[in-house]
Amino acid sequence: MSEETKADETKVLDSIDILRILALLPHRYPFLMVDRIEAIDSDLSCVGYKNVTANEPHFQGHFPNNPVMPGVLIIEGMAQTAGAICIHAKGADRKPSLVYFMTIDEAKFRRPVRPGDVLEYHMTRLNKRRNMWWYRGEARVGGEIVAEARVGAMIAEE
């Protein structure tokens, strides 16, 4: 097996834990919406995970006695997942970069996400041009699609 093949396999089998996500993204509590990323194929695709807990501040007002995760935060989690793999694909020695969320298209929300759910963000790259990326994302809980959208982001270069 060539060194190039080994490197490609490593990229496909790679995973990013919360400590690495914190090193890649500038987002912090309470606005960090991804806990782990797996099944990474360079910047082409991945699956991010978010453990939804009742302790998150948005549940205090959305909605009292009927906690539902705001859809915009689900979409934000998709964008953060895509941004993290873009930065990760640029190289392991990168410091946190600013990722600007540029577009949201074709967003659909299928069912509520509640405390105790584990969100899976299935992201697939649609296009890349210079420092901009576009992804199609599906958010799933228990294999069921709960939201979907196309998102575009730009990584600010220093």
From Swiss-Prot:
Catalysed reactions, as listed in the record: a (3R)-hydroxyacyl-[ACP] = a (2E)-enoyl-[ACP] + H2O
Lipid metabolism recorded as keyword: yes
Record bears the keyword Membrane: no
Major subcellular site: cytoplasm
Active site: H62
One of the record's GO cellular component terms: cytoplasm
An example Gene Ontology biological process: lipid A biosynthetic process
Residue ranges crossing the lipid bilayer per the database entry: none
Record key words, sorted: Cytoplasm, Lipid A biosynthesis, Lipid biosynthesis, Lipid metabolism, Lyase
Entry-linked InterPro entries: FabA_FabZ, FabZ, HotDog_dom_sf
Compartments it resides in: Cytoplasm
EC number: 4.2.1.59
Pfam families: FabA
GO molecular function, one term: (3R)-hydroxyacyl-[acyl-carrier-protein] dehydratase activity
Family per record: Belongs to the thioester dehydratase family. FabZ subfamily.
General function of this protein: Involved in unsaturated fatty acids biosynthesis. Catalyzes the dehydration of short chain beta-hydroxyacyl-ACPs and long chain saturated and unsaturated beta-hydroxyacyl-ACPs.
PANTHER family associated with the record: 3-HYDROXYACYL-[ACYL-CARRIER-PROTEIN] DEHYDRATASE (PTHR30272:SF1)
Descriptive protein name: 3-hydroxyacyl-[acyl-carrier-protein] dehydratase FabZ
Gene: fabZ
